[in-house]
Amino acid sequence: MTPMYPELLTDLVTDLPHAVRLQRLVSGLRTHFRCGAVALLRLEEEHLRPVAVDGLVRDTLGRRFAVSLHPRLAAILARRDVTCFHHDSMLPDPYDGLIDEHVGEPLPVHDCMGTSLHLDGRPWGVLTLDALTVGTFDAAAQAELQRLTVIVEAAIRTTRLEAEIRALQLARGKQPDGEGPADDGEIIGQSQAIAGLLHELEVVADTDLPVLLLGETGVGKELFAHRLHRHSRRRGHPLVHVNCAALPESLAESELFGHARGAFSGATGERPGRFEAAAGGTLFLDEVGELPLSIQAKLLRTLQNGEIQRLGSDRPRRVNVRVIAATNRNLREHVRDGSFRADLFHRLSVYPIPIPPLRERGNDVLLLAGRFLELNRARLGMRSLRLSAAAQDALRRYRWPGNVRELEHVISRAALRCVSRGADRNDIVTLEAELLDLDGLELPAGSAHHAAEAAIAHPALPTGATLREAVEQTQRACIEQALRAHDGSWAKAARQLGMDASNLHKLAKRLGSK
C-alpha cells in the first residue's frame, strides 16, 4: 500500500462539490487497499443509505440497508474499531450480487472489513471494504484503515459544514444552534434535472411565497412539498396536507375553513379547519385544480387578506400560513374554459416549479429501482434481489407514463412474479426484462384512448387469473379511461363513473392506480 494521506488532505482543503469529494474518497480508498469495492453509508434512523460507492452496481445508491437485516453492517456499526470478516465468516454479505466483477452471482470466498464513523460523538454511518482475494485485509491493512478513519471523518465533517454554510447563505439568517439543514433522504436522484429542481426548491424554501408544483401523476409532488417545508423557516410548525380531489363539495368549506356551532345539521360544536390547523406552518393543497369554483372564491379571499371565516360564523380570523399547491392539470387551460379562477391561478402561481417526469431523469430510474428492489427484498425475505443488464436497459427505454409510482409497482409486481414461479429466496434472484412486462405496458403514440376502451371490453388477464383479479383489472381500466377522458380530473372521472370522488380515490389506491 502506498500512502494516500497527501491526496486526502488536499481534498480536505479544496473547494469541491460534496458528492465529488466523497466519491474521490471511496475511489482513492479502493485503489489504496487494492480491493474490489468500497462503500460509504450514512445512518438514517434504522437504515444505512449509500452516499458514495466504488466497485458496486449503480442501483446500490438507491438502496436502503436495514441494519437489523444485515448482521455484518450491524456488527461494524456496533464497534468503534475496525471490524474484519475473514473468508470463512458465515454471516451473509449485504453486497451479494452487487459487486461489479460478479454482478448477479454469489460472491466468491473473500475478505471484508469496515469501521463505524462518528461525528460530534454520535454515530454517522459506516465505511465498508470488500476484497475478492483472501488475505487482503491482514493486520497491517486493518491498522491502516484505523489510521485513515480520522481523515475520513474529517472529510465528512467538512462536507457537512460546507452544506450548512450554503444553507445559511441562502436563508440569509442563522440556523438554530446545533441544527443543520435537514437531509430528507426520500428524494433519490443524481440527474441534472433533479439537481436543478432541488436547487430551485432550496432558493424558494425560506421565503413565504406561494409555490405551485406542476407535474404529471406519480412524479412525487408531495415529497417535494415536504422538502420545501422542512427547509423553510416554518419547519418547526405543522405541515398540513389536504387532498382537494377527495373533498366532497358539500364538506369542502368546513374542512378548509372550519365551522361554527349550529352551522349545519350535526355541527354540535366549534371546529377549526385545515388553515387553522396549519397555523404558523404550511398548508399543502394537493390536486388544487379539483376545487369547486365556490371554494376557489373563498380560498382567494384568504390568500389576499390572510383571513378565514368559519362556516356559519361572521367573525373573520387571522391566519399565518404559507400555501403550497400542486396539480397534474394544465390550469391555464382550465382558466380559459372557466373551470378555474384566473385570479386564484395568479395568486397560487407566484412561483411555479415544474417537476420533471421520470423519462427525463436519465439514470435516476436505476437508483429508484434499487430503492424498490431493496424494499421488496426485505418484504419478501429474499437473500438478494437485483436487475439483469437487459432489465436495466428496459427500464431506461420505457417512457414511464405513471412515473415513479409506476416504477414502484413494476418492481413489486416483478418480484412477486419471480417468487410465484419458484425462485429460491436463499439464492441471488435476478429480475429479467420479461418479468417487468414493460412491452405490455407501452402504448403507441395516440393509442391510449382506444387501448383503454379495448382493455375494458376485452381485459388482457394473466393466465389462471381469479375472478377477483379479473374484476380489479377491469376496475383499473375503467378508472384510467375516465381519467384520460377528463384530462386527469378525479372529480369529473368520479361523476362519469357514478361515484363519490373520495371513494374513487380510495378504490384507486387499493388497486395500485394512485
Swiss-Prot record:
<keyword id="KW-0547">Nucleotide-binding</keyword>
<keyword id="KW-0614">Plasmid</keyword>
<dbReference type="GO" id="GO:0000160">
    <property type="term" value="P:phosphorelay signal transduction system"/>
</dbReference>
<dbReference type="InterPro" id="IPR025662">
    <property type="entry name" value="Sigma_54_int_dom_ATP-bd_1"/>
</dbReference>
<dbReference type="InterPro" id="IPR027417">
    <property type="entry name" value="P-loop_NTPase"/>
</dbReference>
<dbReference type="InterPro" id="IPR025944">
    <property type="entry name" value="Sigma_54_int_dom_CS"/>
</dbReference>
<dbReference type="GO" id="GO:0019333">
    <property type="term" value="P:denitrification pathway"/>
</dbReference>
<comment type="function">
    <text>Required for the nitric oxide (NO) induced expression of NO reductase. Not required for expression of 2 other pathway members, nitrate reductase (nirS) and nitrous oxide reductase (nosZ).</text>
</comment>
<dbReference type="InterPro" id="IPR002197">
    <property type="entry name" value="HTH_Fis"/>
</dbReference>
<dbReference type="GO" id="GO:0043565">
    <property type="term" value="F:sequence-specific DNA binding"/>
</dbReference>
<dbReference type="InterPro" id="IPR003593">
    <property type="entry name" value="AAA+_ATPase"/>
</dbReference>
<feature type="modified residue" description="4-aspartylphosphate">
    <location>
        <position position="54"/>
    </location>
</feature>
<dbReference type="GO" id="GO:0005524">
    <property type="term" value="F:ATP binding"/>
</dbReference>
<feature type="DNA-binding region" description="H-T-H motif">
    <location>
        <begin position="490"/>
        <end position="509"/>
    </location>
</feature>
<dbReference type="InterPro" id="IPR025943">
    <property type="entry name" value="Sigma_54_int_dom_ATP-bd_2"/>
</dbReference>
<feature type="binding site">
    <location>
        <begin position="287"/>
        <end position="296"/>
    </location>
    <ligand>
        <name>ATP</name>
    </ligand>
</feature>
<dbReference type="GO" id="GO:0016887">
    <property type="term" value="F:ATP hydrolysis activity"/>
</dbReference>
<dbReference type="InterPro" id="IPR029016">
    <property type="entry name" value="GAF-like_dom_sf"/>
</dbReference>
<dbReference type="GO" id="GO:0006355">
    <property type="term" value="P:regulation of DNA-templated transcription"/>
</dbReference>
<dbReference type="Pfam" id="PF00158">
    <property type="entry name" value="Sigma54_activat"/>
</dbReference>
<keyword id="KW-0067">ATP-binding</keyword>
<dbReference type="InterPro" id="IPR003018">
    <property type="entry name" value="GAF"/>
</dbReference>
<protein>
    <recommendedName>
        <fullName>Nitric oxide reductase transcription regulator NorR1</fullName>
    </recommendedName>
</protein>
<keyword id="KW-0804">Transcription</keyword>
<dbReference type="Pfam" id="PF02954">
    <property type="entry name" value="HTH_8"/>
</dbReference>
<feature type="domain" description="Sigma-54 factor interaction">
    <location>
        <begin position="187"/>
        <end position="416"/>
    </location>
</feature>
<dbReference type="InterPro" id="IPR009057">
    <property type="entry name" value="Homeodomain-like_sf"/>
</dbReference>
<keyword id="KW-0902">Two-component regulatory system</keyword>
<comment type="pathway">
    <text>Nitrogen metabolism; nitrate reduction (denitrification) [regulation].</text>
</comment>
<keyword id="KW-0597">Phosphoprotein</keyword>
<keyword id="KW-0805">Transcription regulation</keyword>
<feature type="binding site">
    <location>
        <begin position="215"/>
        <end position="222"/>
    </location>
    <ligand>
        <name>ATP</name>
    </ligand>
</feature>
<keyword id="KW-0238">DNA-binding</keyword>
<dbReference type="InterPro" id="IPR002078">
    <property type="entry name" value="Sigma_54_int"/>
</dbReference>
<dbReference type="Pfam" id="PF01590">
    <property type="entry name" value="GAF"/>
</dbReference>
